[in-house]
Structures are given as structure tokens and as C-alpha cells.
């Protein structure tokens, strides 16, 4: 009986295991689970969105129907539906969905920052008076100086009389209208 040479397997035709182009990428089971869990969380975020926000996100009809169903389901059925949504997301390109969701979140954050700035400006208007009114008029030249002064005067009276800050709220609403009409 003859013994085969040790390198006999190297000469098999069509064997290109060591080809540099066919690099095998090994992914751990834990990493696959983490990715699946992340997609499930993305699905849960989509389920928590309202109808108007969902309209702004690029979803196909199957995924949209699954999300709308999950919004109606409670308890254990919801968990299973979230699992299904996660599975559906694994089969799709989720980058456009993530980008649209980030855009929605960013818009909300920008609105919160704007409201804080307007609240600060309102407080300055009440404390500083005409100096702050001049600043508002430089920001928004079409603002009504007389209306602002009247609201500031009423807000100061309410503050001195320990009354509810109705005029302060009106100042904030007026500033918000000015900011919205500008953009």
C-alpha cells in the first residue's frame, strides 16, 4: 500500500480557500445578538412614534403595517410583535430609517433649545424693560414695540401683585410667533 504525499490536498483543482479576495469574516454569536437587540430597540422607537412622525420615515407597507399593529397590541403580544419588527428590520437597509429618526429627534431638541432661549428673553424683557425691547426689535424688526411694552408692563404688575403670570405667558407666545414667522 502506497502512502499519499502530505501535500496531495493542495493540488485539488478549484480549491481557492487561500484566495485573498475570499476573506472570511468571522462574527461572534454575541455580536449578532447585540445587533438584533439594537434593531429591536429601533423597532420599539418606531412603535412609540405618532402617526405624523411615522409618515416622515421611509417605511415599506409590510413594516408600516407591523408597526401600526404593534401600536394597538398590549402586553405579551406587543413583545412578540416587537420581535417580528426586529426580524423585519434585519432583512432591510435600516440606515434611511435611522437617519429619518435622528432628524426627528434633532428637530425636537432644536425646538427645546429655542424655547429655552425665548423663556430667557422673556425674563429679560420683564426685568430690563426697554433695553431688552430694543434687542427684540433688532432680532425681529417687524415686532410691535407698543404691544411688547404693554405686555411687559402688565407682567410687572402681575409679578408685584403675586398674580398668575398671564402676561408673561402672552409675551412668550408672542416671541414664539415672531420666531416661527421668521423661519
From Swiss-Prot:
**Which gene name belongs to this protein?**
darP
What are its GO biological-process terms?
A: assembly of large subunit precursor of preribosome
**Predominant cellular place of this UniProt entry's protein:** cytoplasm
Q: Which organism is it from?
A: Salmonella paratyphi A (strain AKU_12601)
Tagged with keyword Iron = no
Query: Which family does the record claim for this protein?
Result: Belongs to the DarP family.
Supply the alphabetized keyword list: Cytoplasm, Ribosome biogenesis, RNA-binding, rRNA-binding
The places in or outside the cell where this protein is found are:
Cytoplasm
**InterPro entries from the UniProt entry:** DarP (IPR006839), DarP_sf (IPR023153)
The protein, known as: Dual-action ribosomal maturation protein DarP
Tell me, in a sentence or two, what this protein's role is.
Member of a network of 50S ribosomal subunit biogenesis factors which assembles along the 30S-50S interface, preventing incorrect 23S rRNA structures from forming. Promotes peptidyl transferase center (PTC) maturation.
Q: Does the keyword Acyltransferase apply?
A: no
Which NCBIfam families does this one have? PRK05255.1-1 (NF003593)
Q: Name one GO cellular component term.
A: cytosol
- Listed GO molecular functions? ribosome binding; rRNA binding
| Pfam families for the chain | DarP (PF04751)
Amino acid at each position: 500500500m502506497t502512502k499519499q504525499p502530505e501535500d496531495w490536498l493542495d493540488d485539488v483543482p478549484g480549491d481557492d480557500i487561500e484566495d485573498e479576495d475570499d476573506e472570511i469574516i468571522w462574527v461572534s454569536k454575541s455580536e449578532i445578538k447585540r445587533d438584533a437587540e439594537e434593531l429591536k430597540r429601533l423597532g420599539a422607537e418606531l412603535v412609540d412614534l405618532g402617526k405624523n412622525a411615522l409618515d416622515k420615515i421611509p417605511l415599506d407597507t409590510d413594516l408600516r403595517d407591523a408597526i401600526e399593529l404593534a401600536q394597538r397590541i398590549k402586553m405579551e403580544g406587543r413583545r412578540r410583535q416587537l420581535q417580528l419588527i426586529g426580524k423585519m428590520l434585519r432583512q432591510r437597509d435600516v440606515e434611511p430609517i435611522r437617519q429619518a429618526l435622528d432628524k426627528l429627534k434633532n428637530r425636537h431638541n432644536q425646538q427645546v433649545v429655542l424655547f429655552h432661549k425665548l423663556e430667557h428673553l422673556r425674563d429679560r424683557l420683564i426685568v430690563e424693560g426697554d433695553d431688552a425691547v430694543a434687542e427684540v426689535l433688532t432680532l425681529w424688526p417687524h415686532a410691535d414695540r407698543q404691544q411688547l411694552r404693554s405686555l411687559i408692563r402688565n407682567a410687572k404688575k402681575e409679578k408685584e401683585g403675586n398674580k398668575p403670570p398671564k402676561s408673561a405667558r402672552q409675551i412668550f407666545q408672542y416671541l414664539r410667533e415672531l420666531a416661527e414667522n421668521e423661519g
